[in-house]
């Protein structure tokens, strides 16, 4: 009988420990009691009485004429900025990095080598798209002279070929020296 009591006591302690472990692990600090619902009482608007208005005495203010003095109008000089005319030749500066114009080598090599179809001129033409014809010619001339394109060619012919592919014109009297 003693073994039956000790087994029952051991089972009781084991279940007790299990119960306390589970309740401690799922501790919820929630308010389990529901709040009583309060029915809001209808609000009765309080009567509003107009505040008494106190008439203010009207005192006429004397009008003082302000003297008007005409201000002389001084014509502001609008100087028009004088831009020096560009001289023909490649003495100008290219607003594009000449190394980026290396993509134009594909256009020239595609035109010189026998290939089926047309070479893709889009990367080259998109670089000089926003430039005027003279700036585009200066940029391509700089790239050709620096041999950025990696092709030894006749510079004036290559320049006009590149400009024609991009639907640009070589400015008259322009010399890529």
UniProtKB/Swiss-Prot annotation:
Stimuli inducing this protein: Transient slight accumulation in response to a brief exposures to cold.
Entries under SUPFAM superfamilies matching the protein: Bifunctional inhibitor/lipid-transfer protein/seed storage 2S albumin
Sequence repeat locations: 52-56, 57-61, 62-66, 67-71, 72-76
Signal sequence, renumbered to the chain: 1-25
UniProt-listed SMART domains: AAI
Major localisation: secreted
Compositionally biased intervals (Pro residues): 37-87
Domain of life: Eukaryota
Chain spans, region 5 X 58 AA repeats of P-S-[IV]-P-[ST]: 52-76
GO cellular component: extracellular region
InterPro entries given in the database record: Bifun_inhib/LTP/seed_sf, Bifunc_inhib/LTP/seed_store, Hydrophob_seed_dom, Plant_LTP/defense-related
Cellular localization per UniProt: Secreted, Cell wall
Region (Disordered): 34-90
Keywords per UniProt: Cell wall, Repeat, Secreted, Signal
Family of this protein: Belongs to the plant LTP family. PEARLI1 subfamily.
Role: Probable lipid transfer protein (LTP). May improve freezing survival.
Entry protein name: pEARLI1-like lipid transfer protein 3
Organism, scientific name: Arabidopsis thaliana (Mouse-ear cress)
């Amino acid at each position: 009988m003693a073994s039956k009591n000790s087994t029952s006591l051991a089972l009781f302690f084991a279940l007790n420990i299990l119960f306390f472990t589970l309740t401690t692990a799922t501790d919820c600090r929630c308010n389990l009691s529901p709040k009583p619902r309060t029915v809001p009482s209808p609000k009765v608007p309080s009567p509003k009485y107009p505040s008494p208005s106190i008439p203010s005495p009207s005192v006429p203010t004397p009008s003082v004429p302000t003297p008007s003095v005409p201000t002389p109008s001084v014509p502001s000089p609008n100087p028009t900025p004088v831009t020096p005319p560009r001289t023909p030749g490649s003495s100008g500066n290219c607003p594009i990095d000449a190394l980026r114009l290396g993509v134009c080598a594909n256009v020239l090599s595609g035109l010189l080598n026998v290939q089926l179809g047309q070479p893709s001129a889009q990367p080259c033409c998109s670089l000089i798209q926003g430039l005027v014809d003279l700036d585009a010619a200066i940029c391509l001339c700089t790239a050709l002279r620096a041999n950025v394109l990696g092709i030894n060619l006749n510079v004036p012919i290559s320049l006009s070929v590149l400009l024609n592919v991009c639907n640009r014109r070589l400015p008259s009297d322009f010399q890529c020296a």
